[in-house]
Amino acid sequence: IVTNVSEYLPGLKKFLGKTFLGKIFGDIKIGTPNIPKRANVHQFQDLLAQAPSSLPAVSFDPKVDIAALPYTGGTTGNPKGVMLTHYNMISAQVSGQAAFPGFEEGKEVIIAFLPFFHIYGQVVLMLNGLTQGHTLVLFTTPDTEGILEAMEKYKATVFYGVPTLYEYLKDHKDTNKVSWKRLK
């Protein structure tokens, strides 16, 4: 499947996406890449046009079938896929709720800078945040200043991070501008 996500955004967001990319990469043409027509290459727009209006019923075993394949460096530092079943993900969500009994369903504001393709970002942050109805403040390219600004602007109550980032935040010149007591 070959696609360009900006083509599917509503008007203003489509324009801003193209404008922002242009500032980063210079004068580039954004659109469908020139991919040779082959039997195994499909344009996303064509697949959408062919999609049925209702989807067929699918049977699966939640304890066996894979729901997601996030990546982690684990203890070795080498990236590896973690095969999560539907059951694993629900168990993680239930464990997340039990681990943080002080969180109020639908009331927390989470700074979500961790990548969702990584197991920590996908399961702990995204899955638990969304299933509990929390607000996730997303970053496409997180930076220390942006994280600190967002923590105050959105009145963050939850911040999941990694030790390296905690060090950067601790030593940052603007860290005293954040109400850290609000975090749970």
Where are these regions (language model features)?
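ANL superfamily adenylate-forming
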Residues: 1-63, 172-173
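Adenylate-forming
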Residues: 2-11, 142-143, 156-184
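Flexible, glycine-rich phosphate/dinucleotide-binding loops
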Residues: 8-9, 75, 119, 145
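A generic structural signal for alpha->beta connector loops
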Residues: 37-40, 107, 133, 182
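Conserved adenylate-forming
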Residues: 51-64, 69-112, 132-134, 177-178
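Short hydrophobic "strand-cap" motifs at the C-terminus of beta-strands
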Residues: 69, 113-114, 139, 162
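Proline-centered helix-kink/hinge sites
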Residues: 79-81, 115, 144, 163
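Conserved AMP-binding/adenylation subdomain of ANL enzymes
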Residues: 90-109, 117-158, 168-173
